[in-house]
Amino acid sequence: MLYSKIMVPYDGSEHAKHALEYAKGLAAISDAKIAIVHVVPSGVMGVDQIGTEGSLDGVPLGMLNYEQYEGVVRAALDQAKEKVTENLAGLVEDIANIVTIDVVAGTAPAEALARYADKNGCDLIVMGRRGLGAIRGMLGSVSFGLLRSTDVPVLTVK
């Protein structure tokens, strides 16, 4: 068996979609599972604002206890997973039996992806060369950061 678990970071970009198609081909010849992983910036969920003025889902940030905050984060991750799953609908129907879709939070996407790969036993990462915000002609910052953050082989796809 060449690979057993291939991780595909997914941000909805064309490069991410191409990476998924490439990973599907690799999975077919190596009988591997595919983990599609989307990173939600933790700042979107108010991580950097806890204990300050303002509110998150109508609850004053200074009054959130751990359980309340955990519930808000879980709801944000669930909502993001729902959107990603909808976005992937036409792309994963043919591999539904070997694919999982996960959403993780992190302040740095590359580090969050590296942690996921290490924690979940991924033996290959197939990702787009550039994401939604990358400058044309350059290796994306997440791709570059992931290369430095993990020992798992990273294959970038145009």
Predicted regions and their residues:
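Short, well-ordered secondary-structure micro-motifs
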Residues: A19, G46-Q49, E111-A114, G137-M138
